[in-house]
Amino acid sequence: MNKPHQRVGSISNAHVGKDFEAVALEIFASRGIYLESDLKLPVGVGEHKKLHAFDLGCEEQMIIVECKCHKWTAPNDNVPSAKLTVWNEAMYYFLVAPQGYRKILFVLRDVSERRQETLAEYYVRTYGHLIPEDVEIWEVDEDGQEVVQQSFNKALHRTSR
C-alpha cells in the first residue's frame, strides 16, 4: 500500500513518535531530569479543566514536554504546514497548563538546505506570536548526540503588525 506521508523506513508515524520520545527520555535523564511518559495534568481556561496527557513530564520537578519529530516535506524542502498546526496546538496546551511548570517543546533538528534554517527556527520566525514566553524549544539532531536549547524571549522576537 502506498503511504506517501509515512516516514521512509518506519513501520508507522506513531512508531517514529514513540521512538523519538524514548530518545528524549534518555537525553533528559543524562541531564538529571527524570520524566515519565504520558503525564496527565488538568488543563483549561477558567474553572473548567480536563486532563491532557503531555508526552513527557514530572509532577515533582514540575516539567512538561511535548515531542515533535517532524521534518521539512520531501523532496523539495516544503513547509509541513499541517504538522506545524500540531506545534500550535502544543503551544495552546502549554498556555493553559497549570502555572509554575517548566514547558519544553522537544523537536527534531531538521535543516532546510534551501532556506538555511531549521524547522524550529522557521516555526519561531513564523509563529512566534503564538509561543508563550515561558516555553523552551530544544532541538536534537537525528542521532541524538547534539541538543540545541533555547528559551523563547518575546522581547528579542519582533513580528510584523
Predicted regions: what they are:
Residues 68-126:
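Catalytic cores of nucleic-acid endonucleases
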